[in-house]
């Protein structure tokens, strides 16, 4: 008895071969965006360096927050040389790597730009504001790293997207898992980065780990 399934399959294959027909995979939204941007994928770039370079750098560079803040307040250049980084071009401020440990004294969790304020020196007053997302302001993690720089990117748009990708990565890896209730009075330990704040303003820490 003839095998009609095989015969039909061969006939279809023959038609496809003769007509030059081929099946093309539909790209995902991310793949389509990457193709449209010439292969630039900031989220993938951040993921590839996060464990191997970013975490080890922050762990090595970060000082105790109270020490970093005290030195930055009296001598920003000295604090920057020891704990910080800034782009050589332009007038970018220092961004410092710090290890913050303390007690949460205030929590704002209703906003998308949620944060907690932390007392790091046990005086009952807030010393730093820690962003807990999902919306994270600034690009402190990118700006604290001495192994990435603007000249490696095509333009300011790519550089900005790269900075935002760090925030997206941190949010998915760490911040989404944090509880949102009953935070006041809890202890917090975090390593991250923050730009030199304006006088009288709290340091705004972006968590790295």
Predicted features and spans:
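Sec-dependent bacterial lipoprotein signal peptides
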Residues: 1-21
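OB-fold and OB-like single-stranded nucleic-acid-recognition modules
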Residues: 5, 20-209
């Amino acid at each position: 008895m003839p095998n009609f399934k095989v015969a039909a399959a061969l006939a279809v294959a023959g038609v496809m071969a003769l007509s030059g027909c081929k099946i093309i995979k539909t790209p995902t939204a991310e793949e389509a965006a990457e193709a449209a941007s010439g292969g630039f994928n900031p989220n993938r770039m951040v993921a590839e360096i996060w464990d191997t370079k970013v975490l080890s750098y922050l762990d090595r560079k970060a000082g105790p927050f109270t020490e970093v803040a005290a030195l930055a307040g009296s001598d920003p250049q000295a604090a920057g040389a020891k704990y910080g980084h800034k782009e050589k071009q332009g007038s970018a401020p220092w961004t410092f790597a710090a290890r913050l440990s303390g007690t949460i004294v205030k929590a704002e969790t209703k906003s998308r730009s949620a944060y907690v304020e932390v007392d790091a020196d046990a005086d009952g007053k807030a010393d730093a504001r820690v962003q807990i997302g999902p919306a994270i302001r600034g690009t402190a993690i990118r700006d604290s790293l001495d192994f990435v720089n603007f000249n490696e990117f095509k333009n300011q748009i790519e550089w900005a997207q790269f900075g935002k990708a760090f925030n997206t990565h941190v949010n998915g890896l760490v911040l989404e898992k944090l509880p949102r209730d009953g935070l006041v009075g809890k202890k917090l330990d975090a390593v991250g980065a923050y730009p030199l704040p304006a006088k009288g303003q709290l340091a705004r820490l972006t968590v790295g780990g």
